[in-house]
């Protein structure tokens, strides 16, 4: 089992306030891992720190296929093979999707023939052919925007894909659509870390591992059955089983995961 992403004793703070507290995580190539946790638990912060967003005081280590990540800027991490899918993909009117992803592939060192082949194959695989001549994410539904991001990743061929709240703000049909795209993306050449509040997307994407983050710490890991436990009893059930104090230092509400099945966009 070859590790795509390795995170060791990672802490991150903003203005002296610690958000991530000693994160340990291994993501092998070929696996999809789900990272779940209450709002404000630090899930998206982990994604931001790994992708190189500035403004965090970071200690610890993170490696992509054995190469150190910390200290590199966003572009350098992308060239190593780390890509992030965003909660709210932006529209770029006037810049055609096909040209946009082809230029990014050229920047990554791909030749013309390879780019043409990869764009055509991925567009067919993710049902994006009809959008190639349209502005990036222009007039697309929420589900189509998220699928567009996965399409772009498939063309560029990352080693690790970070999918941050990819199901946020989507209705159930769009969640199913995005989940199908994630399943199509599964490959022995890529590790996928899917960050979510909800267990509903895990009805369609069966993760190899589920990790639970509470108050900036990874407190539990297991198979898909861990997501079932969360849906049945909420995060407080996990806290109780692990002997953790209820509510957490951030005053988290004692909500069941099923109570979080709304289409409101959350920032974590």
Predicted regions and their residues:
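Conserved structural motif at the start of ABC-family nucleotide-binding domains
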Residues: 5-7, 20-22
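The feature captures the beta-strand-to-loop junction immediately N-terminal to the Walker
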Residues: 36-38
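ABC ATPase NBD Q-loop/coupling interface
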Residues: 61-77, 137
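Q-loop/switch helix immediately C-terminal to the Walker
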Residues: 88, 94-107
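Conserved ABC ATPase "signature" region
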Residues: 114-131
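ABC ATPase C-loop
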Residues: 153-154
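Walker B catalytic motif
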Residues: 165-166
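Conserved beta-strand-loop-alpha-helix hinge in the C-terminal portion
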Residues: 213, 217-240
């Amino acid at each position: 089992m070859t590790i795509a992403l390795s995170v060791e004793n990672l802490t991150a703070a903003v203005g002296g306030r610690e958000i991530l507290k000693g994160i340990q995580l291994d993501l092998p190539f070929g696996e999809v891992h789900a990272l779940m946790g209450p709002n404000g638990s630090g899930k998206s912060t982990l994604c931001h720190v790994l992708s190189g967003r500035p403004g965090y005081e970071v200690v610890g280590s993170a490696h992509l296929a054995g190469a150190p990540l910390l200290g590199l800027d966003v572009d350098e991490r992308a060239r190593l093979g780390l890509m992030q899918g965003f909660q709210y993909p932006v529209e770029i009117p006037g810049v055609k999707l096909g040209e946009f992803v082809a230029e990014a592939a050229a920047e990554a060192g791909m030749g013309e023939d390879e780019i043409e082949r990869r764009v055509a194959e991925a567009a067919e695989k993710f049902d994006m052919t009809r959008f190639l001549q349209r502005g990036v994410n222009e007039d697309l539904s929420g589900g189509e925007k998220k699928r567009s991001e996965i399409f772009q990743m498939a063309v560029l061929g990352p080693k690790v894909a970070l999918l941050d709240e990819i199901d946020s703000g989507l209705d159930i049909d769009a969640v199913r659509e995005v989940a199908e795209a994630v399943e199509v993306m599964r490959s022995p050449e890529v590790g996928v870390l899917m960050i979510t509040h909800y267990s509903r997307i895990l009805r369609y994407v069966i993760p190899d591992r589920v990790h639970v983050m509470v108050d900036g710490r990874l407190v539990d890991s297991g198979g898909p059955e861990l997501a079932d436990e969360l849906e049945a009893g909420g995060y407080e059930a996990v806290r109780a089983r692990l002997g953790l104090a209820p509510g957490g230092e951030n005053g988290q509400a004692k909500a069941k995961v099923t109570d979080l099945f709304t289409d409101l966009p959350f920032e974590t």
